[in-house]
């Protein structure tokens, strides 16, 4: 009886973990064209897309070559973290954009 109970708990825990793990890894498929619109509406006031010159924030030209204006490696997760949390002087877009909009703008920024 005790072994059945332990087996049931282990199986239920494994099933819950599997469902949670798959739910956490699913990202919306990015739409670069929509990301350009999101950028125009939310980012273009502070960032040039076609220059490395500073506006309010740094210009973003050249990110497609793999480097952020800070000199750090340009990765999806790093750019998403900047969108969500930004440096201290940048507005956070964590609660201003949907997950889809964030994925779209990250995909677009990675083409600059």
Which residues does each predicted region cover?
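Post-cleavage N-terminal segment of exported redox proteins
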Residues: 1-31, 82, 109-112
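Pocket-edge positions in alpha/beta enzyme catalytic cores
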Residues: 27, 71, 94-97
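The canonical Cys-X-X-Cys-His
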Residues: 35, 39-49, 105, 109
């Amino acid at each position: 009886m005790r072994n059945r109970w332990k087996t049931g708990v282990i199986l239920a825990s494994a099933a819950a973990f599997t469902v949670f793990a798959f739910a956490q890894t699913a990202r919306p498929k990015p739409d670069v064209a929509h990301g350009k619109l999101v950028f125009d509406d939310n980012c273009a006031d502070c960032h040039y897309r076609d220059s490395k010159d500073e506006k309010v924030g740094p210009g973003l030209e050249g990110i497609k070559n793999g480097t952020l204006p800070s000199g750090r490696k340009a990765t999806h997760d790093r750019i998403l973290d900047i969108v969500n949390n930004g440096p201290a002087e940048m507005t956070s877009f964590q609660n201003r954009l949907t997950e889809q909009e964030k994925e779209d703008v990250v995909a677009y920024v990675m083409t600059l």
